[in-house]
A protein has these predicted regions:
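Conserved SAM-binding loop of SAM-dependent methyltransferases across substrates and taxa
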Residues: 81-96
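Conserved small/polar residues in nucleotide/adenosyl-binding loops
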Residues: 137-139
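Conserved SAM-binding motif I beta-strand of class I
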Residues: 100-105
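Conserved class I S-adenosyl-L-methionine
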Residues: 71-80
Length: 139
């Protein structure tokens, strides 16, 4: 992962993203590529590492500026393949490890992937298999 690209975002830059964090993001890219061969984690059109980095990792990293560090939880509604939730969880390991990231996803297969990634990377996440938007219809 090119630190110059990641460091172009204010909070990420101010905290000087560690080599370890960049390595974890690279591991995530590899896991996405591998699992995407079996199930549709991300668009099949975006399969090269550089495209995944730019389209998903870097785009997702931008949200770090909007995570309120005064709270101990944040959530990603309809996380799909884990963007931005997994990226936030990876970066939060260094910023505020106690923050739990709740990832809501309706796809059973994607939830399994999210749980595998979270466990393998020791992320502070909770994967919730639920169509959150379906619940809102009854409100």
């Amino acid at each position: 992962m090119d630190n110059a690209i990641l460091n172009s975002y204010s909070k990420v830059s101010n905290l000087d993203v560690s080599r370890e964090t960049c390595n974890e993001l690279e591991s995530l890219v590899s896991m996405i590529q591998e699992k995407n061969k079996e199930i549709n984690i991300i668009s099949k059109k975006i399969y090269e590492k550089e495209a995944i980095r730019e389209r998903h990792i870097i785009d997702s990293a931008q949200i770090i500026d909007f995570v309120d560090l005064n709270y101990n939880t944040t959530c990603d509604l309809g996380t799909g393949g884990g963007m931005p939730g997994l990226i936030v969880a990876i970066v939060m390991k260094k910023i505020k490890n106690s923050m739990k990231i709740h990832l809501y996803e309706k796809s059973h297969h994607k939830c399994i992937f999210l749980k595998e990634v979270s466990k393998k990377m020791n992320l502070n996440t909770e994967i919730i298999h639920k169509d959150i938007f379906l619940s809102l219809i009854h409100i």
